Amino acid sequence: MTLNVDEEVERLKEEIKRLAQPRPDGSYVVKFGVLFSDDRCANIFEALVGTLRAAKKRKVVTYDGELLLQGVHDNVEIVLLKPPTQATQAEGVGA
C-alpha cells in the first residue's frame, strides 16, 4: 500500500498523538528516538525522516534542525503543533 504525502502526514499526526505527551497548549511532543524505534511507525512509514520533513514544511510539526539521524538525534523533540482555531483560519482569509 502506497500512501501519498498528505496521507502520510495525517498518519504521522495520529502516531505522534499515540506516542507523545500532550501539552497544556494543545500540542504534543515526542522524542525522535521514540518515533524512530516504534515498531508500528517502522511498519507504516517507509521514510520517516522524509515524512517528518514534509510535515515540517506544511507547519504541522516543528523540530530543531533539518535532517534527523537515528542515534545522533534521538533526543530531539518533535512537536505536533496545535491545529489553528476556526477564528485563526478566518483571520488568515484575504490577508
From Swiss-Prot:
Gene3D superfamilies in the cross-refs: Costar domain (1.10.10.1540)
One GO term of the biological process aspect: regulation of actin filament-based process
InterPro entries: Costars, Costars_dom, Costars_sf
Pfam families in the record: Costars
PANTHER family hit by this protein: COSTARS FAMILY PROTEIN ABRACL (PTHR46334:SF1)
Assigned protein family: Belongs to the costars family.
Protein name, UniProt field: Costars family protein WS02710_H03
Organism placement in taxonomy: Eukaryota, Viridiplantae, Streptophyta, Embryophyta, Tracheophyta
